[in-house]
């Protein structure tokens, strides 16, 4: 599911995960069929794995150990 862009400039540390999370929410049945907002669908538990990956990426930006290990995410 991750998308890798060679020609696209860097948009930040967690830009790839954030973009994939947004695409997952917009393509979910919750948004398309039920007509709910992506925020409501995220609270209901859709795209949970990407939400957790985005959280881990953001948390690794604040972690001092990430200097040695590198940031999580793509």
From Swiss-Prot:
Disulphide-bridged cysteine pairs: 30-57, 41-47
Motif Cx10C motif in this chain: 30-41
Domain CHCH: 27-65
Positions of short motif Cx9C motif: 47-57
InterPro entries membership: Cyt_c_oxidase_assmbl_Pet191 (IPR018793)
Highest rank taxon of the organism: Eukaryota
GO biological process terms, semicolon-separated: leukocyte differentiation; multicellular organism growth; spleen development; thymus development
Pfam families associated with the record: Pet191_N
Record-listed Phosphoserine modification sites: 37
Entry GO CC: mitochondrion
Keyword line: Disulfide bond, Phosphoprotein
Functional note: Involved in an early step of the mitochondrial complex IV assembly process.
Family affiliation: Belongs to the PET191 family.
Annotated protein name in UniProt: Cytochrome c oxidase assembly factor 5
Lineage: Eukaryota, Metazoa, Chordata, Craniata, Vertebrata
Gene behind this protein: Coa5
């Amino acid at each position: 599911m991750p998308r890798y862009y060679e020609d696209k400039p860097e948009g930040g540390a967690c830009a790839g995960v954030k973009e994939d999370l947004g695409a997952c929410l917009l393509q979910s049945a919750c948004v398309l069929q039920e007509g709910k907002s992506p925020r409501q669908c995220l609270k209901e538990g859709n795209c949970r794995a990407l939400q957790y990956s985005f959280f881990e990426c953001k948390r690794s930006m604040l972690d001092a150990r990430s200097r040695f290990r590198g940031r999580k995410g793509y």
